[in-house]
Regions:
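Active-site donor/metal-binding and catalytic loop motifs
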Residues: 18, 193-213
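A conserved acidic beta->alpha catalytic loop
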Residues: 22, 37-46, 90
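Short beta-strand-to-loop acidic/aromatic patch adjacent to the donor-nucleotide binding site
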Residues: 80-89
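Non-catalytic, C-terminal membrane-associated alpha-helical segments of glycosyltransferases
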Residues: 216-224, 235-291
Length: 291
C-alpha cells in the first residue's frame, strides 16, 4: 500500500518548512512526500532544490485549486493508493496519518480534525447543503465520537483512496481558490461514507480570533457561485433554486454597497470593490485566475 502526501505552497516558505517537518515526523511511513510549488518568489524554489527527500513540482501560480488538482493527478498517475492533501500553513500531529488509516476499512475518504493554534476546533468545511449553497457548522458534540460522518471535506488534511479519484476525477482548477475542496469532498461523499477522524489532529497556524477580511478571498467566493451552480446542475439535474440565487444577488449588492462599515476605510473599500467585481465576473462566468 503506497501513501503519497503533497503540500501546495505559495510564498510562505517559513510555514512550508514547519509543515514539511511535521510530515517528516509521521509515525506511519510516507512513500512519497511531494511539494507543489505554485510559482513562489520567496526563496522556496532554491530551498526545495536542497531537499533530497522531496518530490518537487514547480508550476505557475494556478491558485490552491490548480495546485491540488496537479498534486492529485501526480499521485494518482504515479500509482499512489492513498493520497493525503496538505496546505502550507497546517501542521499534522505525529500520529495524524496513522490515526486516519486506522479507519481505512470504513471509508475511502477521510478527513483530519482541524484545530486552531489556540486549541479550538475548526467548525467549518465538513457539511454542505447543496440545495441552499450553504456550509453548516459542526457542533462540539460530534467530537465525543471517535469519528463521524460528513458530506464534504477540506484539502487541509483530506485523505482519499485512488478508487474514489478514478470515479470523480481531479479537483477542479477552474475555482482558483475557495469552493474547490468543498465540491470535491461532496463528490467523494457520493461514493463512500466520508468521515472525520477525531484523533487525526491537524493544527492550523492561525488562532480562532484571527478573523481576516480578504478582498482576494471574497472576490473568488462570490465569483465561484456560477461554478457551484454548475455542480448543482450536474449532481441534481437542476440549477440552484430561485431563492438561493436571489439571496446570492442580495448578499452581493448589500456587501458591495454598504457592507463592512466596521472596517477601516481603505480595507472597507477594497472589500466592497472585490465583492462587486466577483459578482460581475460570476455573471460573465469567468474561471481560473481573474483577480
Amino acid at each position: 500500500m503506497k501513501v503519497y502526501v503533497f503540500i501546495v505552497t505559495y510564498n510562505r516558505l517559513s510555514l512550508l518548512k514547519k509543515t514539511i517537518n511535521s510530515l517528516r515526523k509521521q509515525t506511519y511511513p510516507i512513500d512519497n512526500l511531494c511539494v507543489i510549488n505554485n510559482g513562489s518568489t520567496d526563496g522556496a524554489y532554491e530551498w526545495l532544490l536542497e531537499q533530497q527527500d522531496l518530490t518537487v513540482i514547480h508550476q505557475e501560480n494556478l491558485g490552491g485549486a490548480g495546485g491540488f488538482s496537479r498534486g492529485v493527478q501526480y499521485a494518482y498517475e504515479d500509482g499512489a493508493d492513498w493520497i493525503w492533501m496538505m496546505d502550507d500553513d497546517v501542521y499534522p500531529e505525529s500520529n495524524c496519518l496513522e490515526q486516519l488509516l486506522k479507519y481505512k476499512e470504513h471509508s475511502l475518504c477521510l478527513q483530519s480534525a482541524r484545530y486552531f493554534s489556540d486549541g479550538i476546533y475548526v467548525p467549518w468545511g465538513y457539511r454542505y447543503d447543496l440545495s441552499r449553497d450553504f456550509e453548516e457548522k459542526i457542533s462540539a458534540d460530534n467530537y465525543k465520537k471517535e469519528f463521524f460522518s460528513v458530506n464534504t471535506g477540506c484539502f487541509e488534511g483530506m485523505l482519499i483512496h485512488r478508487s474514489i479519484v478514478a470515479k470523480i476525477g481531479y479537483p477542479d482548477k477552474r475555482f482558483f481558490i475557495t469552493s474547490d475542496d468543498r465540491m470535491y469532498g461532496y463528490l467523494a461523499s457520493k461514493h463512500t461514507d466520508l468521515i472525520l477522524v477525531r484523533d487525526a489532529r491537524l493544527n492550523r497556524e492561525a488562532t480562532f480570533g484571527e478573523v481576516k477580511y480578504s478582498p482576494f478571498y471574497s472576490y473568488y467566493l462570490y465569483r465561484n457561485f456560477h461554478l457551484r451552480d454548475e455542480y448543482c446542475k450536474a449532481i441534481t439535474g437542476k440549477s440552484f433554486p430561485l431563492k438561493v440565487k436571489m439571496m446570492y444577488v442580495l448578499s452581493a449588492l448589500k456587501n458591495s454597497l454598504i457592507g463592512y462599515s466596521f472596517l477601516e476605510p481603505s480595507l472597507r473599500k477594497k472589500m466592497r470593490t472585490a465583492i462587486w467585481k466577483g459578482f460581475v465576473d460570476c455573471l460573465r462566468k469567468k474561471e481560473n485566475k481573474t483577480f
